[in-house]
């Protein structure tokens, strides 16, 4: 039995080219649904779901939103180095079961976001993405309290923000 390389199974370029701004409330496209299916996400009744982007300092940042009808809080999820938000299905499902809205972003150079693969010039670039994600959450009217969850590099971004920035 031979293994088929992942690159032959899922090609992200057409999906990336078709993404719309996160703020647009359009239903998921066929390419977006295929991406979600590839990573094991099952559509949920009574949960609005979006996959889109927002711009930060020349990067087009891919973001995913899941919003139940009456969420009790919001979880902002930041992945680790060489990861992307599609790999965090179990955390996202846990948060949805707990009644949270979830906003998950792909860091620059990761997943569906633009930028050289897994490479930034300065850690401050990640801080700019976090601040922009928080602004997106606010603009989308995601409910407080906001909970932050980061794994590895994502956790370091959150700790740096909490220690050195003015949290919202």
Name each model feature, range by range.
Residues 155-166:
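Short glycine-enriched nucleophile-adjacent loop
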Residues 72-73, 99-100, 144-145:
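Short coil/turn segments at beta-strand junctions that form active-site/ligand-binding loops
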Residues 141-152:
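Alpha/beta-hydrolase fold nucleophile elbow
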Residues 79-86, 151-155:
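Short, conserved structural micro-motifs that define repeat-unit consensus positions
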Residues 72-80:
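Short beta-strand element of the alpha/beta-hydrolase
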Residues 3-55, 61-67:
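An N-terminal hydrophobic leader/cap segment in hydrolases
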Residues 92-115:
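Conserved alpha/beta-hydrolase
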């Amino acid at each position: 039995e031979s293994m088929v390389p992942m690159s032959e199974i899922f090609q992200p370029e057409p999906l990336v080219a078709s993404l719309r701004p996160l703020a647009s409330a359009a239903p998921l496209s066929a390419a977006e649904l295929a991406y979600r299916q590839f990573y094991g996400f099952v559509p949920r009744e009574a949960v609005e779901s979006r996959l889109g982007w927002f711009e930060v300092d020349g990067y087009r940042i891919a973001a995913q939103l899941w919003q139940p009808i009456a969420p009790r809080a919001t979880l902002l999820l930041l992945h680790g180095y060489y990861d992307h938000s599609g790999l965090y299905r179990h955390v996202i499902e846990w948060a949805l079961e707990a009644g949270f809205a979830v906003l998950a972003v792909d860091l620059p150079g990761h997943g569906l976001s633009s930028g050289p693969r897994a490479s930034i010039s300065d850690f401050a670039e990640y801080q700019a993405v976090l601040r922009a994600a928080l602004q997106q959450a606010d603009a989308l009217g995601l409910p407080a309290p906001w909970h932050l969850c980061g794994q590895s590099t994502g956790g370091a971004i959150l700790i740096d923000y909490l220690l050195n920035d003015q949290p919202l």
